[in-house]
């Protein structure tokens, strides 16, 4: 299979596939006599795992670790589960931070009259000027 076939099947771009190869995140493909990369089902599995791991929030390094676990016949599902639950905890923390930012912005918006005057508690609060406090 060539890189364009793999790109179509995995939903990755050829550029992304080459990038993952350069970073050592996938098994290096064999080269044909003409120098073209030749991919196997193993490559499809690794690249699909990388794409899907990235989609659910794993960073590049973590995704590579999952590929290593995928290729390790001695892996323990407990390791994969632990990493997944750690990622869930990270995402939950990020959600809490986003909710806090949302609440702050809503409080600022509620404090602003939103009329034609120049007085804007949002700008004043964000700039630290004039000691206006929202909410």
UniProtKB/Swiss-Prot annotation:
DNA-binding segment(s): 4-23
GO CC, alphabetical: cytoplasm
Domain HTH merR-type: 1-69
Gene Ontology BP annotations: positive regulation of DNA-templated transcription
The keyword Nucleotide-binding appears for this protein: no
Record's keyword annotation contains Lipid biosynthesis: no
Compartments where found: Cytoplasm
Keyword annotations: Activator, Copper, Cytoplasm, DNA-binding, Metal-binding, Transcription, Transcription regulation
Sample GO molecular function, one term: DNA-binding transcription factor activity
Signal sequence segment: none
Family annotation (InterPro entries): CueR (IPR011789), DNA-bd_dom_put_sf (IPR009061), MerR-type_HTH_dom (IPR000551), MerR_fam (IPR047057)
Residues where Cu(+) binds: 112, 120
Subunit annotation: Homodimer.
Task performed by this protein: Regulates the transcription of the copA and cueO genes. It detects cytoplasmic copper stress and activates transcription in response to increasing copper concentrations.
NCBIfam families the UniProt entry points to: CueR (TIGR02044), PRK10227.1 (NF007590)
Domain notes from UniProt: It contains a N-terminal DNA binding region and a C-terminal metal binding region.
The protein's name: HTH-type transcriptional regulator CueR
Organism, as annotated: Escherichia coli O6:H1 (strain CFT073 / ATCC 700928 / UPEC)
Gene expressing this chain: cueR
């Amino acid at each position: 299979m060539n890189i364009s076939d793999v790109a179509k099947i995995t939903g990755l771009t050829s550029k992304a596939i080459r990038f993952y190869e350069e970073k050592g995140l996938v098994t290096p493909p064999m080269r044909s006599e003409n120098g073209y990369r030749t991919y196997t089902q193993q490559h499809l599995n690794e690249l699909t795992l990388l794409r899907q791991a990235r989609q659910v929030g794993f960073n590049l390094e973590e995704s590579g670790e999952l590929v290593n676990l995928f290729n390790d016949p001695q892996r323990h599902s407990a390791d994969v589960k632990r990493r997944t639950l750690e990622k869930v905890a990270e995402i939950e923390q990020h959600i809490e931070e986003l909710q806090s930012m949302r609440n702050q912005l809503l409080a600022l918006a509620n404090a602003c009259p939103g009329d034609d005057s120049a007085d804007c508690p949002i700008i004043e609060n964000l700039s630290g000027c004039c000691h206006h406090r929202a909410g």
